[in-house]
Amino acid sequence: MKESTEETVWQVRNSFFGVYVHFPYCFKKCDYCDFYSEGIGAGPANDELSLFKSYQKEVSERVSHFPNLKHRTIDTVFFGGGTPSKAKTKNWYHFLEFLRSEFNVARDLEISIEVNPEDLSPQLLEEYAKIGINRVNVGVQTRNPKGLAYLGRHYDKEKYDSLLQTLTHSPIQRVGIDLMYGIPGLQTSDFYSDLSYILEAGLPHLSLYSLTLEKGTQYSRDVKDHKKTEPEENIQSEILTALPELMEKHGYRWYEVSNYAKPGFESKHNLKYWTYEPYLGIGPGAHGMIEGHRYGNPRNASLYQKKTPTNQYEPVTPNSELALTLFRLFSPFRYLEFIEMYLDKSSQAKYIETIHLWEKRGLCSISNGIFQWKKEALLLLDDLILSIIV
Ligand code: SF4
């Protein structure tokens, strides 16, 4: 994506797909995290090599099931987790070589990796740049030690203190940070102090999202046992609604509820999820969507390596799913193209009728088949999306 002053209008794209790879190990399991991940301390994972072999095996099996993938082109690869920066760079390199040998790959292939602060270093970024990784996202969440302790996150003070210095001197230009707000015990001003510290560095991508309480996490058990409290919803709504204007002043485009980018620096991979493009999900706990079918892998690394059924798929249900993803976008998109491509006639009529009602209420603009939310829709978003699918 080139930097441009014109806003990108998202549209249906038919000849590409993305690859997501889940590396399930972390230094420590955070209390609020509901991704499949296991805390294993500072050392490497015992099964790292066999896990990478299983990734290749899974890709091959899924391609045998969907041979048409060979006619598409991979334009995004995303190493997520867990903490993929915990894995050896050479293993990512071999995996990328494998993909290049098996598939058509776009010339401007986006290759992203999530990095945790404890792994970040100038040397690591050099290594990544050498193997073609061209996008790095660091899960910071907060720089406040009290907040990190509340979240049960590993905190390496030296690394947290030097991370902006490292990122602003990165050989990889497309770098971003995740920050979280609404952490109990922290004030609104704590979040803004983190944000302004990071804004000064001018990184091209920021994900700013609220803490949520997910079932099955340590955090949810602690809330149930009255050891911790729920996320601060009032603070969250206040920050959520203030952010678009503030970020715009700093030159960022608000392209998804929680995501801001300098022009041309949007995450092409994450846009696939919101624009209903196909992707292979590889690794334990990963999900994929290919040729109108979804699948999910076992949330257990050894079970995944022993036996992952690669012939079990559920058909997608675009009449309801499309709204859940597409209408999270706050940048403009060609809504008529999307609904004509994915929905049956009666759902198309329902979508169009509802969108016109939203326009009358001043919640969105529509023109020449292009849809864009207005800020007024933000706090109502969940209900609005629900209203289009029921
Ligand atoms: S580091 Fe990330 S993936 Fe790992 S437990 Fe924490 S939030 Fe989850």
Regions found by a protein language model. Give the residues of each.
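Accessory beta->alpha helical hairpin/"wing" motif in late/C-terminal subdomains of nucleic-acid enzymes
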Residues: 368-384
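A short, conserved structural fragment
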Residues: 359-369
